[in-house]
Structure formats: structure tokens, C-alpha cells
Amino acid sequence: MQRRHFLQKTLLALPIIFSGNLLTGCKTNLSDDYLPDDKITNNPNLLQNKLKEILPIWENKFNAKIGMTIIADNGELSSHRGNEYFPVNSTIKAFIASHILLLVDKEKLDLNEKIIIKESDLIEYSPVCKKYFDENKPISISELCEATITLSDNGSANILLDKIGGLTAFNQFLKEIGADMVLANNEPLLNRSHYGETSDTAKPIPYTKSLKALIVGNILSNQSKEQLITWLINDKVADNLLRKYLPKNWRIGDKTGTGSESKNIIAVIWNENNKPYFISLFITQPHDGKSLDFKNQKDEIMAQIGKEIYPFL
């Protein structure tokens, strides 16, 4: 299916977050609130107070560290441990797909380009790659991006990293969008990072600012932003997390990540007034203090945190 035809079919299902014509290219008249270099304020607010109230309780209960940042569409920022390093795990896949979209905008890649899956691509948890390999069928870059975000397919993510130009090129992209992090490994090794380390980890504040910049800033064309939103909304492995208690008539697009001692998510949530909030939530335990209760309940911890903060969005 051609990219434009796909977008036309999905456009009406998406939240409206842009100003100007949605399909007229990269440099449209977006409001100042939506620029990637917007001024983030740290004014005290009810949401900030709520984070400071509830997150230490969860941390103490499970001997965990929780990093969370929420940025409203007007730039107001609320955060807990926002400048501490947390494992990114598979949340980074949303940024990998975003880099692909940027290269498409620059006409350096084509989403319709077909790739042959090799046996060496079939690393741990690569269901989509395995399907195409078993059927001896080529897969498009668009399908690889979809698999990477909606099913967190590891092999797809690694193939896309290769198309980008490897970790060096991807880290340059992360630097340019202000993510303030370094990815040192691809899948599955990137999941072995720990809280406080400085590779394969991110700080919630710059990570969330970068997410906002990709979705409503002027880094990507409006077509690419719509495509990214579509993939995030169609995430198929996140129902038990922030989606679980999402209020009726709200919308969410997200990308999850899981490690042996961590759970994390990045998301954009639109409330009933279609106002977007950009969120990063990282939950981890020190690798010398693992708890079986934490391992079994980290999904529900994340869901409950969402339930507690939704009244403030």
C-alpha cells in the first residue's frame, strides 16, 4: 500500500494536534508551543505535587527507583528523578522508527523498500521477522517500523538500525533532537543496562522533550508525524500499562520497554479536550536488590501510577 493512501485512510482516526495543513510538508506554521526548542518551565503545580506525593510511596514499597516526566502542550513540566539515568530498553525503538521517518523525509530512504530477512536477523523475540523468513517473503521498511513499535520486534529494530547507518549515525540523531543519551548496543544487549549507568539509559526530562519534539515539533514532516502517531496508537503490547485505566474518550500512543529489573514507557496522551501530554515513566530496581514482588507487579505499578495522575491531566 502506498504511504499516502495509508495515511489518508488513518487520518480521521487520529487526534488533531497540528495547526496548518497536515500534508503540506515539513515547515508549516506550527505554534511556538510545539517547537522542539520550546521553553520548559518548572513552575509548581498540582501535578508536580502529586508526583512528589505518590512516587516515593511506590519506591519505598518495592525498593525501586521511579523516574517520571510529564510535559503539557504549553510546556509546563512536572517530574520526579527527571535528571537521573534509567534503562531505556525497547522504548528506544520509537526513536529508531523516527530516525527512519526523518531519512524518508530527506528522500534518503523509501518506506516501500523491500528487505530480505536473513537467519542471522532472527534474534530473541523477533516474531515478525521469523514469519517473513519462514515464508521466504521480503518485508518493507514500513512493515519493519510497524513491527518494531507495535510488537517490539527485536530483529526488526536491528535491521532498521543498520538502514540508519548503525549506532554512530543513530547517536548523532539522538544528539540533534536533544535526547541527551548514548545507545551503546543494539538488541538484545541494550536491555542489560542498569539504573545510574550512562549508556543505554536516558534521563526522563530530555527523553520526554525529545518525544514531544518528534510528535509536534518541526523535526519530521506532518506526514511522518502522522505515521509515527499511528504506529504508537496501534501498540499491541501495552494494554496492561498506562492504557489499563485510561479514562473513557481519552487517546494514547505509546512504546514500552522491559528489562530483567525494569519496566518503562513513553507515551503521548490526549485527554477528553484533545490536549496532549507527553510522558516518560521508568521503574527499576537496583540490580543488587531484586524483589519477586516487584517483578510480578511492575506492570500493575505502572498502571496504578497512571490511574493516580489522570485526574490532574
UniProtKB/Swiss-Prot annotation:
UniProt keywords, alphabetically: Antibiotic resistance, Cell membrane, Hydrolase, Lipoprotein, Membrane, Palmitate, Signal
Similarity section: Belongs to the class-A beta-lactamase family.
Domain of life, per lineage: Bacteria
GO biological process, one term: response to antibiotic
Locations listed in the record: Cell membrane
Protein name as catalogued: Beta-lactamase BRO-1
Gene3D superfamilies linked: DD-peptidase/beta-lactamase superfamily (3.40.710.10)
Annotated Gene Ontology cellular component terms: plasma membrane
Record field: catalytic activity: a beta-lactam + H2O = a substituted beta-amino acid
Lipidated residue numbers (N-palmitoyl cysteine): 26
Binding residues annotated for substrate, in chain numbering: 255-257
EC number: 3.5.2.6
SUPFAM superfamilies tied to this protein: beta-lactamase/transpeptidase-like (SSF56601)
Disulfide bond residue pairs: none
Cited PANTHER family: BETA-LACTAMASE, BETA-LACTAMASE-TYPE TRANSPEPTIDASE FOLD CONTAINING PROTEIN
Organism ancestry: Bacteria, Pseudomonadati, Pseudomonadota, Gammaproteobacteria, Moraxellales
Principal subcellular localisation of the protein: membrane
Organism field: Moraxella catarrhalis (Branhamella catarrhalis)
Leftover remarks: The class A beta-lactamase family has a specific amino-acid numbering system, sometimes called Ambler or ABL numbering and often misspelt as Amber. A multiple sequence alignment was used to derive a consensus sequence and then the consensus was numbered taking into account insertions and deletions. This allows use of identical numbers, e.g. for active site residues, despite differences in protein length. UniProt always uses natural numbering of residues, hence there appear to be differences in numbering between this entry and some papers.
Active site: 90
Membrane topology, from the record: Lipid-anchor
GO MF annotation terms: beta-lactamase activity
Annotated signal peptide: 1-25
Gene: bla
